[in-house]
Amino acid sequence: MSAGDLARSGLAAVDPITVEVIGSALSSIVEEMGETLVRAAYSTNVKERRDSSTCLFDAGGRTLCQAMHIPMHLGSLIGVVEHVVARHPVETIREGDVFIGNDAYTGGGTHLPDIVMIEPVFVDGAIAAWATNIAHHADFVDRGHAHIYQEGLRIPPVRLYREGQIHQDVLDLILLNCQVPTERLNDLRAQMAANRQGIQRFRSLCGKYGRDLVLAAGEALLDYTERLTRVGIATIPPGVYAFEDRFDTDEIADEKVFAVRIEVRGDEIFLHFDSPPQVRAGLNLVWTGLLATVYYAVKTLVGPEIPANAGLFRPIHISAPAGTMLNCVAPAAVNSRTQTCQRVVDLIHGALAPAIPDRIIAACNGACVSSTFSGVDPRTGRFYVYLETIGGGSGARATKDGLDGVHVHITNTSNLPVEALEAEYPLVVERYALVEDSGGAGTWRGGLGLLRQIRAEGHDCHAFVHGARRRSAPWGLFGGHEGGKCRIEYSPGVEPPVRAQGLLRHGESVTIITPGAGGYGDPRWRDRSLVRRDLAERVVSPEVARAIYGLDSPEPPPS
């Protein structure tokens, strides 16, 4: 509903209480959609790790509300309505039509495993909103390739349902390109159920308050969010801030340098990014992925409580040269773009550290180490694919230590519990622990990385593990030390020079050690009782406690 439509309807001004009530109802709808998707899902990646998101768009494709799931998925959803109506004019869309896509350049995605499902919400015979969700399908992509044509099946926005009737040929085409079609089919059904839940709830909301009032409140909510964002930006001292960081992963031979220049002008913020030309590896980031990453970073710094909708975007201005790693063009490969996104957030924090040191955190693990194991389960004779991204340390803050062993920034997924992993797959977790001394020393210590050792049991399987920060460690702030680096080792402890991939035979294992995070402040100022606690809990070694923190004659913890 445009401003003119609102004026003609007599609803140009909606009272703040009504806006709050309807805004909260919209939030409840997308959260309920998200829970429906997770509970109905079949794969461990969605039902256990919650690698999915849900969203409502208005009729024009603006984000009304997104569930508090995966910030990166905002990029996968920005522009998806425009992609749909570009291929399927609005006048041809009917109630019961469902569209599906995944392509990073034409399908509303940022990499191919993220499948978007979108359905129009008809109220009083017209499209009032779009119910949308996205889920990461574990076996939907191949890795380590030079361009997107090699990464997997590309799906532009196509109709999966026409007026409630499934296009079986479209579904068959998708499933034929999957290694575990039953898992994919049931996750797609869960996505369908989530959207249907959202449609039902949105219609009920319109039935209670009236379609025009709900749409007017949505418009007011976007304006309110814009005002909150502007107020938050205005708390950053005006000026120009810059930062650069080195980017290394095991998918490219040489380090790359990313840079950002940030200008704060009153209640608006301008961010310009420089990066090398796009590479022949899946580390490139499409434009919408960059938008989502920046929106997340700015939101968390200026107002974490600000609603996640299109009003947030208005005072944030972003630029990056096309054809570069941070704004790639087809046919650049994009599968591992999360590695790149994490570094973008670190860049923004590094640049703004002098301006708002109390809100900034030191560099996080920045790696999003990804592991994929696939083979034939000897217990069932069926093919399996186990995918997991493994967390690490989060950066220390001005008044608190970083968190240990977590996903950070734009990912926000859960870990797969060992019990669920071993029950679902023919794999054994031999070790799962925090990594001593991996948190950067400081007045406030960086979070610790994780160690996970996985063994193939009763069969041979294919393993693919890759990550970042194997050479450039997560940096500290204001005298804080850097965190530990990433390591990937095949038994018997040999670290490959490039990404670890290949045949893992029965009884062999892969050991994954994720980076820690940077410290904040001079470690000599750290409270002695905290150092002793860390020593007792084996967070730091006696050597580090003595040499870095200056603890006199620390006693090693009991064995």
How would you describe each model-predicted region?
Residues S2-E95, I100-V123, I127-P556:
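Glycine/proline-enriched, intrinsically flexible loops and inter-domain linkers
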